[in-house]
Structure formats: C-alpha cells, structure tokens
A protein has these predicted regions:
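Metal-dependent phosphoester/phosphodiester hydrolase catalytic core
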Residues: 1-484
Length: 484
C-alpha cells in the first residue's frame, strides 16, 4: 500500500490545515483526521472510506465485517493491498521481538529476518476474524543489541513497506534509553516531525499509556476500530512503530470518553469487555491484565536494567478505598514490586500521581488518596529502590518532587505532550515542588539509564520535536531508595 510521507511543522497551524492542537482537533474524524497532516493519496482515502463504512454498520462491528465486505475486498484485490496495519513491533527482548500485522482477510503471516548472507523465516501465524485479522509473529534467536532488516510475508508474498523499518534487540549491557509520553489523541500519531525525532534518538522502546489511538467512542467498538485504522494509515506511525517496540496502556479517551471509568452510567460490563478486546487486539503488548474474567489492561515487563509496570487506572475504578486500581490490581502491583530485580522500576499511570494540577481531578487525589498512601508506604516500608513515577492526562508536561514524612522523595515525570495540546500542566510551576512545566508544544519524555555505575543513574529529559532539550534531571539510584 503506497503511502506518501509527510514532514510538516507540527507547531505551525498551516501544517494542520488551519487547526490548532486543542479542542478543535478532538472533534474531527474520518477523512478530515486522516488528511490532517497533508492530503493522503487517493487510494488511501478510498480504502479508509470503505473500511469506515464497513465498521460503522453497527456498534458491534469488528474486522470480520471488513473481511466479509465485498467492496473492501474487491478494492484491495484491485490495488494489490494485503494488509491494513503494521508491521508494529512489541515485546522486545535481548533475543527477539513480536511483529504485529493486520491483514485484509484471514491469512497466513510470516516474518523473514535478513542476516549476513542468509535469512530466517518465523511463523506461520494465522490471522482470523476472531483475532480481528491480527497476527502477531514471535521472532527469536537473534543477537543482543543488533539491528536486522525484515520483511512480512502474507500468504507467502512480501508486503510493500514504504517506510524504513528495522528490528533492534535490547542491548546486553547495563545502558538503555526508553522514550515515553501520553495524549497524542490520535492526531499526534500522524506528526512525522515528532516521529522522526524519536527515531533519531534510537530508544530501545516507547511507552505510551493513555489517550492514544481512539477518541471518545464509548461502546461503539466499530468506531474504536475505525480510529485505529486511521492510526495505521499515518506514515508517521508506520515509520515509528515499524522500528521502535511499543508498550501501551489506556486512559479515559481510549476507554469510553472524557473522565469515564469503571462501568460508566448507562453502559454495561459487556460494553467494557468489548472495548477492552478492541484495545488488546489493536496493540502489541506482552499481556493484558488478568487472564480471566477480571480483565483490565496492565502488565509488567523488563527492559534492560529496568522493570516496567504499566497500570490500568480506568477499568477497576469504583471511587472507594483501593478503588482506583481495584483490590486485585493493587495486590498484583505489590507482588510485582517485591519481585522486581532491575536497578530501576518504572511505574506508569494514565493520570497524575500528585494532586497539584486541577486539584487532583480524575486522579488519585479525588478517587483514592488512601490507596496512593498505602502504595507509597509499602514502597518505603520494604525499601524498594529505584522507583520512578510516570504520569499523564493533564495536557502539557510537568514534573514534581513528592517529599514524604519518611524523608524519602518520589519523583513524578509527565509528558502529556504527544498531541501538542495546551492544558493545565503548563501552570505547574506555581507549586513549590514543581520541576518543570510546558504547554502547547510537541515533546516526548526520555529516560537514559546507566546501571554500570557504582551508583546507577537515570537521566530524565523532556525533548521538543525540534530536538531541543526542554528540561533534564539526573538521579542516582541511592536518591530513589527509601531510608532505613
């Protein structure tokens, strides 16, 4: 599927067809969103229109409707289109990665890794209507810290990939770079300048944990899927996800709508399960919450010297004590914290850890300050070292020290700037514990970890899409270890 690569200035309103990155962009949909960063080729526009029509027939539509839609299938056959999304990398280790692909119809998917003088085939994995036409192929047996070119084969034929992509395994040494951020709100995933900047920094992984690829579609899972289709047609997202392994969790806008959580009023548990299924199939994560009826979107993984725990603050929320994460996820989190062996532990939450922005609106401060205190005391009592708190939701970017009665200080870093939106985070410097505050700018967070030092160190940086470092702070592991 030939896609034109656009590289327009994200901070120039003309690059966004007259829109500014604010509430206006939250309301646009369909072709208007697809063409936001520049007019897509006619074949891409027509393909999306056909898929969107197939997915809009009812609130329960899946990619089975696409696979069975005669107009979609005839169009794809006529234009030699065999995949609708991907390749998207995830679940990276020192020896391998998973490659996610969405096909046009049920198909056999393989991945060919090119090595010196030879190649190796991984798979096959079958995409099906049940899997939402997704196949995730496990690639393993690779060497640590090496880059490999690759091809995706669908029914034995390589698909054209019109952006530069490669697989890079995790390094074996104790140094790693991890990019992160939240709130692209769909359109930020089309920002080629920002994608190019992240790619230039060559992070081993990208963590995104809220307000990502679907926007306020409530229980209409067909429209959720249509939003993800736009994501997969953005050249910027193709170039980023085809080379940088991505790990994701969600927040309110991916979930149902603004500030919604638990089972929202006038909706059902069946609706909640359906939305969870869309999210879990649309991303390439190592796991998704509990592997039973309890559900959720959370997991733990290891990236070099770092344990990464990505939390779900939406699915289980009740407004009661321990109701922010739910009892089950809270106990799971404690078990994971005690089991972590990395020099640093990165914990992501889709909303703010502190109450300093909007008085804790839609976050721990309003819903579960007791649960937050229980968690902080647990970390302190067990002297769990190296904990870093990453947050999102409040548009803009801000950071805080969190001084504790124990004498320990937690650090919170937020980079809710992947969509360039203005928001309350830009006013954070009014608080005495604030570290930085920015708004109305495209930027991403970055953690540079060096665990080879006698006292391992992490350097946080907030990086503008232009490459300018807006803020940086270095912390020793000893500074992130609660006192005895």
């Amino acid at each position: 599927l030939a896609l034109t690569n656009f590289s327009l200035r994200a901070d120039n309103s003309s690059a966004l067809n007259g829109y500014s990155p604010g509430n206006q962009l939250s309301k646009i949909d369909g072709l208007e969103l697809l063409n936001l960063w520049g007019k897509q080729p006619k074949v891409v526009q027509n393909l999306f229109t056909l898929i969107d029509t197939a997915l809009s027939q009812s609130k329960k539509c899946t990619y089975a409707n696409v696979a069975r839609d005669q107009k979609v299938q005839e169009f794809c056959k006529r234009n030699n289109i065999r995949h609708l999304g991907g390749p998207m990398l995830g679940c990276v280790t020192q020896n391998g990665v998973k490659v996610w692909v969405r096909t046009v119809r049920p198909a056999t998917v393989k991945v060919k890794i090119k090595m010196k003088g030879s190649s190796k085939i991984f798979g096959p994995v079958e995409s099906s209507e049940k899997s939402d036409l997704v196949a995730s192929v496990q690639v393993d047996g690779l060497k640590p810290g090496k880059s490999y070119s690759y091809e995706v084969l669908i029914d034995g034929e390589p698909i054209p990939i019109h952006v530069k992509t490669s697989i890079t395994t995790l390094p074996v040494d104790q140094k790693i770079r991890i990019a992160f951020g939240t709130c692209p709100h769909r359109w930020g995933l089309g920002n080629q300048k920002q994608a190019d900047r992240i790619l230039k920094h060559k992070p081993s992984a990208l963590l995104m944990y809220g307000d990502l690829g679907s926007q306020d579609k409530n229980e209409h899972v067909g429209k959720h899927r249509s939003d993800y289709q736009i994501r997969d047609l953005f050249p910027a997202w193709q170039s980023l996800s085809g080379s940088i392994p991505t790990f994701t969790s969600w927040d309110d806008h991916d979930y149902f709508d603004n500030d919604r959580s638990g089972i929202p009023k006038n909706f059902t548990n069946k609706d909640r399960l359906a939305v969870r299924k869309v999210f879990s199939q649309a991303w390439n994560n190592p796991s998704v919450g509990f592997n039973d009826d309890r559900g959720g979107i959370f997991f733990r993984t290891r990236l070099g010297p770092c344990d990464v725990i990505m939390l779900d603050n939406r699915y289980f929320r009740t407004g009661e004590k321990r109701g922010f994460l739910g009892n089950g996820q809270t106990e799971w989190l404690k078990e994971q914290l005690l089991d972590c062996k990395g020099e640093f532990i990165i914990i992501t939450c889709g909303t703010m850890w502190t109450d300093h922005i909007s008085k804790g609106k839609d976050s721990w401060g309003k819903f579960d300050p007791e649960g937050r205190e229980e968690l902080f005391q647990f970390i302190e009592k067990n002297r769990i070292p190296g904990v870093l708190l990453l947050s999102g939701d409040r548009h803009g970017a801000c950071g805080f020290r969190i001084p504790r009665p124990s004498g320990h200080t937690f650090y919170e870093f937020e980079a809710a700037t992947l969509g360039g939106r203005s928001g309350p985070a830009s006013g954070a410097m009014k608080h005495p514990d604030a570290l930085y505050a920015f708004g109305s700018t495209y930027a991403f967070g970055e953690l540079n970890v060096d665990a080879s030092l006698p006292d391992p160190e992490v350097k946080y940086r907030l990086i503008h899409e232009s490459g300018k470092v807006l803020y940086e702070l270095s912390l020793k592991r000893s500074e992130l270890t609660p006192p005895a």
